[in-house]
Amino acid sequence: MSATTLPEPAGAAAVRPAAVSVHGAWKSFGGQQVLAGIDLEVAAGEVLVVLGPSGSGKSTLLRAINHLEQLDAGHVEVGGEPIGVRHYRGRFKELGQRQIRVQRGRIGFVFQNFNLFPHLTALDNVAAAPVATGRATRAEARERARALLDRVGLAERAESYPRQLSGGQQQRVAIARALALEPGVILFDEPTSALDPELVGEVLAVIKDLATSGTTLIVVTHEIGFAREVADSVVFLDGGRVVEQGPPSEVLSAPRHPRTREFLSRVL
């Protein structure tokens, strides 16, 4: 990652401090521009829904937030701390992998295809990260994992393996796993896109419950009804840029930009 100049200090603080700040994010793959100078702030405890067509940069933005993708320029801060980089003589330098892993432990990530360990039970999938990071003993981690599985409605499936679970159940295990390290921010990358339609509701119900917990959520989804009901703010991306941003009542019900209106007319 090339070094980039630090931005000037921000002005007056928001009512709620920023949990996530994206500053001038640029990213391309093979000459294809995927993120084109995105600036974004997500307040602590906010639920942000990110909408946009395929290829608009939604997943890349999420992956950049926890440094699964290195930006070509710009940087991301979580809780005021640069992610994946450090300040060095007025510029940014890449952190070592061990430091990056520590930072990622504070950012939950729920993938669209579950990414569970197939050889571990639901219980051990949830307990794995706290043990691996030294945050808990195996007994402590398993006790908390049982509580988290109960929270997502799967206490009775604790000893089941992923192959024995439906897609919706696997995704709920993945959400419990994301909660195991008690992150301040959780990223959801189209968490219902791989599910049969009848299973979508059970996963959205868990995310709705999380939305009331005070955890900052950033959710990439095409579930417009969910966005209307749960989101504090909606961002519409197209061509790697923020086209429109605001409360659901504005972006979804009275969008200002023609591209937003065109997109919504196709998905509603």
Predicted regions and their residues:
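Catalytic Walker B motif of ABC-type/P-loop ATPase nucleotide-binding domains
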Residues: 186-189
